């Protein structure tokens, strides 16, 4: 059966950066994260054998959420200097592998992934989103869209469908955004409603 795997490239690269030792090329360019990224991507392809594959990276630029809420993600530390040049290297690596590499300026990778997933769903494709980003769990639809978190199950990965999202969050995927808005989301610096925690939300 045809399957479309959408890889959150920025998520993959950050994870590789924190998992790999510091490495540099003969020219002094950091390469450790790219090496880890390549290993993760090759493992994904080898184990799951997707018929279609795309890797999506954040491209920077203005974000519509930050325009509406200036504090959005302002609590996050700046990208480590050693990682910055590796985004371009990772993008070039993906393209050299013959894999579709996507970026959209002024749009987060999440938004691009969500758009592609919904378009593929309408076309009858089986979609697997590869990321550890909980925000993308909102897209899970049984028989259509699943999320694969390769960090789970000691590296074996865990597939999330509607039942798994419900078990983890207590609500179905379509209501996850409401829960995060009510209780807040510290990773995005969203305050939520004072006094409202996970159970109340």
Report residues per predicted region.
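Non-catalytic, usually N-terminal nucleic-acid engagement modules in DNA/RNA processing proteins
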Residues: 1-54, 58-71
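Extended two-metal-dependent nuclease catalytic cores across DNA- and RNA-processing enzymes
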Residues: 23-24, 74-201
């Amino acid at each position: 059966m045809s399957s479309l795997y959408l890889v959150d490239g920025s998520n993959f690269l950050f994870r590789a950066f924190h998992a790999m030792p510091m490495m540099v090329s003969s020219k002094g360019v950091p390469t450790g994260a790219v090496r880890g990224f390549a290993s993760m991507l090759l493992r994904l392809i080898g184990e799951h054998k997707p018929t279609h594959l795309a890797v999506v990276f954040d491209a920077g630029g203005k974000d519509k959420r930050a325009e509406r809420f200036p504090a959005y993600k302002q609590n996050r530390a700046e990208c480590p200097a050693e990682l910055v040049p590796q985004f371009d290297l990772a993008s070039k690596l993906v393209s050299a592998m013959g894999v579709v590499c996507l970026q959209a300026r002024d749009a987060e990778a999440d938004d691009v992934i969500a758009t592609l997933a919904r378009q593929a769903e309408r076309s009858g494709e089986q979609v697997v989103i590869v990321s550890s980003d909980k925000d993308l769990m909102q897209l899970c639809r049984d028989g259509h869209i699943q999320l694969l978190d390769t960090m789970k199950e000691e590296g074996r990965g865990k597939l999330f469908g509607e039942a798994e999202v419900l078990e983890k969050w207590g609500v179905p995927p379509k209501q996850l955004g409401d829960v995060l808005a009510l209780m807040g989301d510290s990773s995005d610096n969203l305050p939520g409603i004072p006094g409202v925690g996970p159970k109340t939300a």
